[in-house]
Amino acid sequence: MMSCNYSFSSISPSSKSAFTSPSNFNLNPRLICCSAGGTVAEPKAINATQPLLLDAVRGKEVERPPVWLMRQAGRYMKSYQLLCEKYPLFRDRSENVDLVVEISLQPWKVFRPDGVILFSDILTPLSGMNIPFDIIKGKGPVIFDPLRTAADVEKVREFIPEKSVPYVGEALTILRKEVNNQAAVLGFVGAPFTLASYVVEGGSSKNFTKIKRLAFAEPKVLHALLQKFATSMAKYIRYQADSGAQAVQIFDSWATELSPVDFEEFSLPYLKQIVDSVKLTHPNLPLILYASGSGGLLERLPLTGVDVVSLDWTVDMADGRRRLGPNVAIQGNVDPGVLFGSKEFITNRINDTVKKAGKGKHILNLGHGIKVGTPEENFAHFFEIAKGLRY
């Protein structure tokens, strides 16, 4: 197990009891005020040519782990809730350049994370592939014509991002200028199996019987669909990178539904194909893979060729680091539910995660997206502690 010694230079007085303070402990750091009442340590000047997150991923020496949180732009923030009142439809918010930029920057302006992720959805490309869908409040994704036959799959079109989702490229270009290398601008896409799960099931699912019936009864049909998604997502990643994204995360949210042997057939080869394709044209673009429920798959994930594996909270960080090996960086993996706890509890969990991750090649994050109802002041506290860490 890797280990490191680190100190905390921006911990609030109420949290000090959780740590042994070093002699140079700074009790009065400069702070940024949070609209929710919390504070975040003011960031130091960052190398204008290389965001901290990119240095960490590439194995360079860094003073602390970079930090950003999945779903950091969104529903837990009061400012986002106000926008939702004005623009109640999700796609009205996620397909409008000005709103995408505004929402993406909301957490950046308050908390200064080391990664600023595009506000969007993994299903955004579907319309451009001739798969009509919507995201309905209280119900989630709805696929109007689920794909379940070879004829259905045949109708799926080639995805051309610059024609189908130009607002994504425009938003990323603006974000890159706004953030100005003080943080890494992050794009993201859905993994082929996860996208296929949505379009076959017709939306979210509890049992995944339809996608599994297709996988086990008509695997050729599913493979044809997965191939179309793999080709399209590779294009989408390149488009995002060319538009300004400095790293891209691939979400395989439903990998948890696959046994290891089925992951090797229906997910791994398509993830590897995406990575190989992107690396041909963008060899230095960091690619992050988040596969939910991947505790039984960890040794297989580096085989995709990604630069970073993002762990969910069901994997012990020290065990995950050991099983993944030294050649990939690691991201995660605080339980999102921890943010409902006390500030001392949150601090202790951050402490535990960073210690187990070891020094370097670690991006501090949650093990899943932020949950609805998370107190904004606890979110602020997470960043205050995280940005005060020192190896």
Swiss-Prot record:
Give the signal peptide as a residue range, or say none if absent.
Answer: none
Residue pairs linked by disulfide bridges in the UniProt entry: none
Q: Which GO terms describe its cellular component?
A: chloroplast
Q: Identify the EC number(s).
A: 4.1.1.37
Q: Which CDD domains match?
A: URO-D
Pathway per the UniProt entry: Porphyrin-containing compound metabolism; protoporphyrin-IX biosynthesis; coproporphyrinogen-III from 5-aminolevulinate: step 4/4
For this protein, the record's InterPro entries field holds: UROD/MetE-like_sf, Uroporphyrinogen_deCO2ase_HemE, Uroporphyrinogen_deCOase
Chief location of this protein within or outside the cell = plastid
Q: Does the keyword Plastid apply?
A: yes
Q: Which GO terms describe its molecular function?
A: uroporphyrinogen decarboxylase activity
The keyword Lyase is assigned to this record? yes
Biological process (GO) annotations held by this record are:
chlorophyll biosynthetic process; protoporphyrinogen IX biosynthetic process
Q: Which key words are in the record? A: Chlorophyll biosynthesis, Chloroplast, Decarboxylase, Lyase, Plastid, Porphyrin biosynthesis, Transit peptide
User: Member of which family?
Assistant: Belongs to the uroporphyrinogen decarboxylase family.
Tell me the subunit arrangement. Homodimer.
Q: What does this protein do?
A: Catalyzes the decarboxylation of four acetate groups of uroporphyrinogen-III to yield coproporphyrinogen-III.
In Swiss-Prot or TrEMBL terms, this protein is called: Uroporphyrinogen decarboxylase, chloroplastic
